[in-house]
């Protein structure tokens, strides 16, 4: 069985996918010929690296929905956004405070920029072994001694645990540091008041969300939100240029 046959077999299985991506293979739109949508940066299809038309409109709509300064669409996942966000906040050799349960892309950013990591540890549920939230008291204790360029947390976690981002943001900003939140599993928060507040609403500076995890978007679709002017848009956009694929997939 080749890959095409395997995917066709999976698609025909009568099973509900209790996993990513968020569209659950629901067939929200019909695309009989995917090749018809696969085009390069010709005049009529806009350019993700210099959006002026439909892509710019999409980002403006997202900015209004999420209440941000800027929202940048990503086609190579939250990993791209995390690398760009940390690069925009730090210079090579800086100290960075990160939650020990962060995504591996955070550690890749530490490696690429030769950053000095200092860890904050989540509490652990003794019965399940699941990591709980990061306490604001622990963040305050750690950053008082380290004066990091930025603090990076994951909220919600893979298991859905949310930290008190509002309290943490206040502490981080009192120390003239920046707060980056990996909200990859919380892109749906803004769509109902029954969900927790987004990290943007609670004062984080840069927030990364994976639209494909909990919303009806194709795999690798993500967004980087610039939620405050503490981080220059020019720096964010510069590092997105470096991290984004030069050949974009529009589908």
Where do the model's predicted regions map?
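N-terminal "arm"/small-domain region of PLP-dependent enzymes with the aminotransferase-like
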Residues: 1-53
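Conserved PLP-enzyme active-site core in the AAT-like
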Residues: 3-9, 29, 50, 65-68, ...
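Conserved N-terminal alpha-helix of the aminotransferase class I/II PLP-enzyme fold
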Residues: 35-78, 101
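Pocket-edge structural micro-motifs
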Residues: 22, 75, 249
């Amino acid at each position: 069985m080749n890959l095409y046959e395997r995917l066709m077999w999976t698609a025909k299985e009568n099973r509900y996918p209790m996993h990513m991506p968020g569209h659950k293979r629901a067939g929200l739109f019909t695309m009989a010929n995917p090749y018809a949508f696969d085009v390069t940066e010709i005049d009529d299809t806009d350019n993700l690296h210099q959006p002026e038309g439909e892509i710019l409109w999409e980002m403006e709509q997202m900015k209004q929905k999420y209440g941000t300064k800027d929202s940048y669409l990503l086609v190579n996942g939250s990993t791209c956004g995390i690398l760009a966000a940390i690069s925009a906040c730090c210079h090579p050799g800086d100290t960075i405070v990160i939650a020990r349960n962060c995504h591996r892309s955070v550690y890749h950013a530490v490696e690429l920029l030769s950053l000095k990591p200092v860890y904050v540890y989540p509490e652990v549920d003794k019965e399940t072994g699941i990591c709980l939230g990061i306490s604001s008291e622990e963040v305050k204790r750690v950053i008082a001694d380290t004066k990091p360029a930025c603090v990076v947390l994951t909220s919600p976690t893979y298991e859905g645990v949310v930290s008190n981002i509002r309290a943490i943001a206040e502490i981080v900003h009192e120390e003239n540091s920046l707060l980056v939140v990996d909200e990859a599993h919380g892109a749906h928060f803004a769509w109902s008041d029954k969900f927790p507040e987004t990290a943007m609403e609670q004062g984080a500076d840069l927030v990364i969300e994976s639209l494909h995890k909990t919303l009806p978007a194709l795999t690798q679709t993500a967004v980087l939100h610039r939620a405050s002017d503490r981080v220059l848009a020019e720096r964010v956009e510069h590092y997105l240029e470096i991290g984004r694929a030069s050949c974009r997939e529009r589908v």
